[in-house]
Amino acid sequence: MEIREIPDLVSGLEKNFAELTNWIENQPNEKFEVSIRPEKWSTGQHLAHLIKSTKPVNLVLRMPKFVLKWRFGINNREEKSYEALVEKYKQKLAEGGTASSPYRPTFISAAQKYTLITEFNDELKKIKTALPRWKDKDLSRYIVPHPLLGKITVRELIFFTIHHTRHHLETIQKDYS
């Protein structure tokens, strides 16, 4: 999958957010809060985790570029492709990487389902508003810290968000279908 340009990034986000949202909307409400095992997240917890992990993306996209440069620096390496970033993420997970505490959800009730779906889709709307304001070259220039992947470019952060949403969709489909 060749994803590089801003319209492709937006399209990838829209597709994965829509598929995840549709799947969750069609899941019976009583299953939204139930976990298949104590160490596994419920569908609601997966959704809450995705919201928690998408909010910083919006923060980065709205942050002045001089602040990004001052806080984190600029890229000095070859940028990873979508596929290479996904492979690095899978490798980190295989090595035992997990969500750090700020991104771990607490119990989520079935009553929160539609509020969380709305909040998740609102995060996508914010990305879709902010991302086109970026110049393509700046997506590759500025870097930000990622708790599992280290310093990554803003484009790689968007790659991650596309894949991360897909990863959680596939997980809940496997665990709760």
What is each stretch, according to the model?
Residues M1-D8, P56-E119:
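Short, helix-capping/interhelical loops that line the mouth of catalytic, cofactor-
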Residues I6, L13, L116-F120, I158-T161:
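Hydrophobic packing residues in well-ordered alpha-helices of helical domains and bundles
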Residues E2-E5, L9-G12, W23, K31-L47:
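Charge-rich, low-complexity N-terminal segments
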Residues E30-K31, S100-I108, V144-L148:
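A short small-residue
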Residues E33-V86, K125, L131-S177:
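Short, contiguous alpha-helical
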Residues Q27-P28, K135:
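Residues that cap or delimit alpha-helices
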